[in-house]
Amino acid sequence: MTRIPEIKFYTSPVYEGKWWDFRLTKPPKINEEQFLQSVNKIRARKQLFQEYLRDITRILGIEWSRKEIEVWMVSLSIGVFSRPLTLSLCWERGKVRDIDHLIDDLTHELIHNALIEHPRYSEALKLLEKDYAPEPFRTYVHILVHAVHVLIYKTKRGEHRMEWDIQKAQSNQPYARAWEIVQKEGPEKILEKYLGSKN
């Protein structure tokens, strides 16, 4: 049985403080009570995220080199990204983020982390660049991410969540373009063509 990394959730005033110190324009943030409530909601869903990670691992057919995945949660509105995996619990306008949005965004970043483990990932990006030039690099990357995420949405989250994600992406052209390609070509076809993954 394939070993799945343990997802561990962390907060760090030092990590968060560095973001605050180096920003010329100070980002919005939620207060401590709101932050702790959101942190607890995320931690309470650890087994859900472990289940999603098992599904992602199965879809990609990967073997993990890591024993754990660290997730750093911050109260600042600085976005969400995969290395180090950082989850902002605050919207741009200083509001608490909805738990459904956080679940979808964290799943997205877990997919990024899983793709990096795939032995054909670098080769796949080169082939995507060849097939979809002159699209930007961010589009190539997210074709693969969205292809995996579609399968999670359809089996775990529901298509209404996928529609929300697609709508959210419309303000970011590379993400939106990646969704267009995945919807046109189909996630299974994309994953088989570029990664050799059959689902």
Descriptions of predicted regions:
Residues R43-Q50, R97-H101, D105, E135-T139:
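Soluble non-cytosolic domains of exported or imported proteins
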Residues P5, T11-K41:
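Acidic/histidine-rich, surface-exposed loop or edge segments in extracytoplasmic proteins
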Residues I56-L60, A114, H118, H149-K156, ...:
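Sec/Tat-exported extracytoplasmic proteins
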Residues G79-P84, W91-R93, I99, R161-N199:
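Compact alpha-helical subdomains of small soluble proteins
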Residues I78-V80, L110, L125:
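Ser/Thr/Asn(+Pro)-rich, low-complexity disordered segments
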Residues L125-P174, A178:
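Post-HExxH zinc-binding segment in Zn-dependent metallohydrolases
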Residues P27-P84, K156-R157:
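Auxiliary, metal-adjacent structural segments of Zn-dependent hydrolase domains
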Residues D100-P119:
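Active-site recognition of the HExxH zinc-binding catalytic motif
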